[in-house]
Every structure is written in structure tokens, then in C-alpha cells.
UniProtKB/Swiss-Prot annotation:
Xref: InterPro entries: 3-IsopropMal_deHydase_ssu, Aconitase/3IPM_dehydase_swvl, AconitaseA/IPMdHydase_ssu_swvl, IPMI_Swivel, LeuD
Single Gene Ontology BP annotation: L-leucine biosynthetic process
Enzyme class: lyase
Record's keyword terms, sorted: Amino-acid biosynthesis, Branched-chain amino acid biosynthesis, Leucine biosynthesis, Lyase
Organism whose genome encodes this protein: Nocardia farcinica (strain IFM 10152)
Record-listed E.C. numbers: 4.2.1.33
Record lineage: Bacteria, Bacillati, Actinomycetota, Actinomycetes, Mycobacteriales
Protein's name according to its UniProt entry: 3-isopropylmalate dehydratase small subunit
A Pfam cross-reference name: Aconitase_C
The keyword Lyase is annotated on this UniProt entry: yes
Length: 202
């Protein structure tokens, strides 16, 4: 997973609240067996509207989504994070996230930055007045900078550390590979193993 420190990208104002995971990626796309290639599924129903924000310049090149409250509610879908990331988003800003979505985001390398609704509305106003406005998201300082305005955001320390280190669940496990190997060596041979014992050909 790519480490996250500072990201600069075009802000996209999504003035919708209670955006659930079925709106982020409809269930029909969950039948795919690949891990990537979900960018076409992101907000699929809404993108059929030519006036939807992601169908307009310069927002179709945005990488920082500024959404309404209660983003990512509904069923738990890692695919929701994958679709946002595959489209190009590195950050989602909202005043409230569903707990499961926030957890999936951190594991998938997507920053879910929580800030006050007043600050979200300030960003909406600035972005709409200056289409193409680039936001600078600094995970080290937990700030979002828009022009001369610097706004704080919240993220728990553990998820912040994982993103800064670029560690997904597999990466976390591999950091302990030496300890795991030593444990396996010291494990009594009479105990069950994950690999079958070799069969003698005699």
C-alpha cells in the first residue's frame, strides 16, 4: 500500500448527505472477482446524469472528495473504497463517516478526514467559487489547506500511523515475518501444521 503523507489535488464538492455504499458502488458490480478496475462503478447511477459533478470539468479530475455528513453508511463493502481509489480519489472529507467505511478506508489506503460541518461547507463554497481549487491534505499535521485557509481534521492515531507507514493488513503481518518464522521453527513437531507431512515414496 502506498504511504500517505501529503496530497494535493482538485477538490470535488458532493453536496449530498447519507451517501451509502450502494450509491457509492451498486451491488451489481460486486460480482467481479478482481481487486482493481472499479472506477466505472463509482456513483454509477448518478453518473448517468450529464450534470452530475463528476461529469463536469474540472471536477472529473478531482482527487479530494468533500462530501456531506454520514458518508459510507449501509452495508460493509471494501469495494466502495476500491471504487473511490480506482477513480483517483486519495481523500474523502466529511463531518461524519460510518464506522465500518472509515475502517475499510484506512485499510485500503484511502484517507477519511473528518472535520466540522461548518468547515465542510466553507470548502464547498470555496471550491464552487473557484472550480479547480486544489486542496493540500497534510496527514502529518492533520490539516487541509485551501488557498490561505487552513482547516483541521480528525483521524485516530492508529489509522494515521498505518497510512503514514503505508501498511495494509498484509503489510502489518509481514513486518513480523521474522517472529512468525521463529515461532514456526520452535513449534513442537507433534502439533498440527498447516502443511501436510511429506509422504514417503518407499
Amino acid at each position: 500500500m502506498e504511504a500517505f503523507t501529503v496530497h494535493k489535488g482538485i477538490g470535488v464538492p458532493l453536496r449530498r448527505s447519507n451517501v451509502d455504499t450502494d450509491q457509492i458502488i451498486p451491488a451489481v458490480y460486486l460480482k467481479r472477482v478482481t481487486r482493481t478496475g472499479f472506477e466505472d462503478a463509482l456513483f454509477a447511477a448518478w453518473r448517468s446524469d450529464p450534470d452530475f459533478i463528476l461529469n463536469t470539468e474540472p471536477f472529473n479530475r478531482g482527487t479530494v472528495l468533500v462530501a456531506g455528513p454520514d458518508f459510507g453508511t449501509g452495508s460493509s463493502r471494501e469495494h466502495a473504497v476500491w471504487a473511490l481509489s480506482d477513480y483517483g480519489f486519495r481523500v474523502v472529507i466529511s463531518s461524519r463517516f460510518a464506522d465500518i467505511f472509515r475502517g475499510n478506508a484506512g485499510k485500503g489506503g484511502l484517507l477519511a478526514a473528518q472535520m466540522s460541518q461548518n468547515d465542510v461547507e466553507m470548502l464547498w463554497k470555496m471550491i464552487e467559487e473557484q472550480p479547480g481549487l486544489e486542496l493540500v491534505v497534510d496527514l502529518r499535521d492533520r490539516t487541509v489547506t485551501a488557498g490561505t485557509v487552513v482547516l483541521p481534521f480528525d483521524i485516530d492515531d492508529y489509522t494515521r500511523w498505518r497510512l503514514l507507514e503505508g501498511l495494509d493488513d498484509i503489510g502489518l503481518t509481514l513486518r513480523r515475518s521474522d517472529v512468525i518464522a521463529e515461532f514456526e521453527k520452535a513449534r513442537p513437531t507433534w502439533k498440527p501444521t498447516t502443511l501436510p507431512a511429506p509422504i514417503s515414496q518407499a
